[in-house]
């Protein structure tokens, strides 16, 4: 049998095992597993935002807003809502953007084993079927630009929005993977500063 044939058989076997193991865990067990994951990821998410979610720049608020707008466009995200007067902007895109596929896998390599470890006491071997699939999700980034002493304070938050039900029999978590959040924030800030430099607003 060809390599592709073996791969197809293994995928079918994995699907059968997933269905079988899903039947061994009650909805209450699955809910408890995702609740535990959400609690852990929420703590990581809030710590990440406190550390990386806010920066201050010696630029005018209007210049920062324009640079943010360009940043999200360069990263392949759609501007869903904006209010230049208030300094707020919302961008979204199909997951894994603003990460690329390689960056998403990098996040999954760190966060997926931890997620399975958290879920395992509640659902047993079903935890091994948990995936960090980007399908059926959109990433939403909220940005705000406020006047600060001699410049502007820029803040970022992120969340996931479901556009299709998960392919597995597990409910979705509410919080994005912590490593994914870190990579996304770092990427946005890098692009934002490139836009400011291109406009000669910062050295």
Q: Where on the chain are the PLM-derived regions?
A:
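Bacterial N-terminal signal peptides that target proteins for export
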Residues: 2-14
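C-terminal motif of bacterial Sec signal peptides marking the signal peptidase cleavage site
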Residues: 20-23
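Ser/Thr-rich, low-complexity intrinsically disordered terminal regions
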Residues: 25-203
């Amino acid at each position: 049998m060809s390599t592709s044939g073996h791969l197809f058989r293994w995928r079918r076997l994995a699907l059968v095992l997933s269905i079988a193991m899903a039947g061994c865990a009650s909805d209450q067990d699955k809910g408890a597993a995702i609740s535990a994951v959400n609690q852990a990821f929420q703590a990581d998410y809030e710590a990440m935002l406190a550390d990386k979610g806010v920066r201050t720049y010696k630029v005018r608020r209007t210049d920062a807003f324009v640079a943010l707008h360009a940043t999200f466009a360069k990263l392949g995200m759609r501007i869903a809502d904006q209010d230049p007067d208030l300094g707020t902007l919302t961008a979204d895109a199909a997951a894994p953007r603003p990460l690329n596929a390689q960056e998403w896998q990098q996040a999954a390599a760190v966060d997926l084993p931890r997620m399975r470890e958290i879920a395992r006491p509640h659902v047993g071997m079903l935890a091994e079927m948990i995936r960090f699939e980007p399908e059926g999700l959109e990433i939403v980034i909220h940005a705000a630009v406020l006047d600060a002493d001699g410049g502007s304070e820029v803040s970022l938050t992120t969340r996931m929005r479901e556009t299709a039900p998960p392919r597995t029999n597990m409910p979705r978590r509410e919080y994005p993977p912590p490593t994914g959040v870190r990579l996304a924030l770092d990427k946005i800030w890098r692009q934002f500063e490139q836009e400011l430099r291109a406009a000669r607003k910062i050295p």
